[in-house]
Amino acid sequence: MKRAFTGKILSPAHAAGFSALAVSGGLFFIREEMAVAPLALFLLFCLVAPFLPQAGFFLPVISRGARDRLAAALTFDDGPDPDVTPGLLELLDRYRLPATFFVVGVEAERHPMLIREILSRGHAVGNHSYHHDPLLMLRSRTRLSDEITRTQELLAGFGIRPRAFRPPVGITNPRLPGVLRTLDMDCITFSCRAGDFGNRLIRGLAKRILKRVHPGAIVLLHDVAPSGVRGIADWLEEVEQIILGLKAKGYEVVPLSQLIGRPVMEPATLPPSGGIPEITRGPEEK
């Protein structure tokens, strides 16, 4: 399991940068024309790393759980969707399975009853930014902070404070660590996905997931409406095949918080009685 956010200022990117400078300085006195190579390699890493959800180059990311048992966690991005999420919740109920929903703030604001339904059925909710801007990591630090904070404030109205943030499209940048440190949040990505392009490609979804699943997998799916007349029905069938396939392989579907050993969400506030608000009781517990 990749380590969670520890609040440390130095990241692998810092270490790589300092190392590149040191090696470059040494090469300058040995063979001047070679001095640029370490710096060029470092810049290449900086260009590629944002697009590697498991890399943890700019900050610690959690992309999987422990490998010591056949367990996996189901996560759903980009919702809630009034055409898709209710049927998905019924399917999860039928098999008594927990899931984590990384919700988009604007969709949560449009469909508050779906957030309440997700929570009342014992699932967890994470932060997936407010607008799901695929270019968010190219925006300013202020814009990035606003996107995450606005969603946190919105979800606090449901009695919860997500501790988990999943960046849109899984892309990170050097500004994200400071924002998450301020909000006391972890960056949680994934280790098993089907390349469904936000449910634009659902044919063979289950086959692709079951081929790539591994012990400790954080499975990425999307609860948004696919195209086509039978799109939603076909997608739900694929999700059910994933559930049945995991069971046939001996996997246990567990809450994400249990898989990674860290809280995914917590109560936003405690009522005067000191108890946990009803809407947040037993997150992800089935």
What are these regions (language model features)?
Residues F5, R163, I171, P177-R212, ...:
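His/Asp/Glu-enriched short active-site or ligand-binding loop at hydrolase and phosphoryl-transfer sites
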Residues M1-L74, P82-E90, R94, H111, ...:
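N-terminal pre-catalytic segment of deacetylase/amide-hydrolase enzymes
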Residues F76-D78, V103-G105, N127-S129, R166-V169, ...:
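A cross-domain feature marking catalytic cores of carbohydrate-active enzymes
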Residues H132-R139, P226-V229:
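A short acidic, helix-capping loop that chelates divalent metal ions and anchors anionic groups
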Residues A49-L136, E147-R150, L154, I160, ...:
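Active-site beta->alpha N-cap acidic-glycine motif
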Residues D77, L92, F101, V125, ...:
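Divalent metal-coordination and catalytic microenvironments
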